Amino acid sequence: MGKDAAPYRQKADELKALVNRKFFNPETGVYAEGTQTAQAIALYLGIVPEGKEQLVADKLCEVVRANNHFLDFGLLGSKSVPAMLTRYGYVEDAMKMITKTEAPSWGYWVETMGYTTLPETWTLSPEFRDASLNHVFMGDVSAWMMNQLAGINYDAVEPGFRHILITPHFVEGMDWVKGEYHSVRGLISSEWKREGGKVTLTVTIPSGCTADIRVGDKTETVGSGTHVKTY
């Protein structure tokens, strides 16, 4: 606090350039060996050279599809792969990954193993006998559901939820989603239902706050209260 940010920005730029010189192929858009995590974490951390972001994301989606949407990552990938697929136009591919029920997957834990909490590792074997069965290690899937399906997000430019971003994704195969967040300013709620070929979105914004509701290429700014939109 109170220190000039310029030296830290310079250091960050130097590190970004170093990573890109060593690991990035600007012609192919591949980082390192092109794994799911390598592609996604570069996007997530903002180190991809300007103008190359979509190329890197396209390569990410290619490797995900080549792996038949199986999860090939740990902690860092669980945080970045679904989120970056969604950011760059591949939300349906992210959804396929998240709803997989064959191991390794979150769905396998629920449907086959009957877990109601998240284990520490994808595979619990005798050598991992001390692993936790209640671990947040792979918990970012819950954040993805809140941020991308329900679409409840904070605005980094307006801290403290003075301004809120509602950016739901109406993914195929789902007819109802609801998310709520008890912010410091009150309850934020986003719910959508698909009926008769249309989607009805109901959003509640706390008193004294504003929000941008973004669906596709349409953005509408609203104030506090409950707002019902049909798409």
Ranges and model annotations:
Residues 9-10, 14-17, 92-231:
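Non-catalytic C-terminal accessory modules of carbohydrate-active enzymes
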Residues 1-129:
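Catalytic cores of carbohydrate-active enzymes
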